[in-house]
C-alpha cells in the first residue's frame, strides 16, 4: 500500500491522497467455513453467493471511492500507480526484472502527470519499457524534456520500423 501511495503521490505531485483496502466477506471465519456454510444455498441458487469473488478492493481518493468521485485523469493515475506497484512487487520477488508496457496510458492525463510518469519510469528502477501513444508530438516533447535514452518505432500496417533521429 505504501509503495502504491508513493507512486501516486509522485505522479500527482502530492496533490491528492489515495488509499487501497481489501474487504473480505469471510470476516473472521476461514474461507473453508464460509464455503461450507453457504453450500446448500449456493446449490439452490445455481451460483456462489459467498467467497473471495465477492470480496472488495476499496479504491479511495481521500475518503471517497475514486470510481465515483475521481476525474478520468485521477482514475487513470490510480491505475498507473497500481500497475507500477505491481511491477515493483514482481521485480522484488522474482528472479528477473519484468518488462513494463504502458499502452496508450497518456490518454485522459494532463501534461504534468504524463511528464511525472515518464520521469519515474525513465529512472534506473524500471529496466526495459515499451510506451505506446497516439499523440507523437506530446510524447516527443516529454521524452526530450526528460532527456533519457530511448528508441522510437513506427508501427504501420503490421510493419515495425525504427525511426531515425531526424524523424523524431
Tell where the protein language model's regions lie, with residue ranges.
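Conserved NTPase motor "head" modules and their coupling/switch loops across ABC/AAA+ ATPases, GTPases
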Residues: 1-99, 108, 112, 116-128, ...
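H-loop (His-switch) motif in ABC-type P-loop NTPases
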Residues: 132-134
Amino acid at each position: 500500500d505504501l509503495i502504491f501511495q508513493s507512486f501516486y503521490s509522485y505522479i500527482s505531485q502530492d496533490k491528492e491522497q489515495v488509499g487501497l483496502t481489501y474487504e473480505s466477506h469471510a470476516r473472521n471465519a476461514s474461507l473453508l467455513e464460509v464455503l461450507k456454510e453457504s453450500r446448500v444455498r449456493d446449490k439452490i441458487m445455481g451460483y456462489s453467493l459467498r467467497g473471495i469473488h465477492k470480496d472488495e478492493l476499496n479504491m479511495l481518493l481521500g475518503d471517497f471511492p475514486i470510481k465515483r468521485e475521481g476525474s478520468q485523469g485521477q482514475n487513470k493515475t490510480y491505475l498507473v500507480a497500481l500497475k507500477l506497484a505491481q511491477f515493483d512487487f514482481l521485480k522484488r520477488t522474482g528472479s528477473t526484472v519484468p518488462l513494463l508496457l504502458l499502452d496508450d496510458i497518456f490518454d485522459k492525463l494532463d501534461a504534468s502527470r504524463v511528464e511525472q510518469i515518464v520521469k519515474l519510469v525513465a529512472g534506473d528502477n524500471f529496466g526495459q519499457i515499451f510506451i505506446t501513444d497516439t499523440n507523437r508530438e506530446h510524447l516527443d516533447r516529454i521524452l526530450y524534456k526528460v532527456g533519457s535514452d530511448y528508441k522510437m518505432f513506427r508501427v504501420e500496417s503490421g510493419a515495425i520500423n525504427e525511426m531515425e533521429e531526424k524523424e523524431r
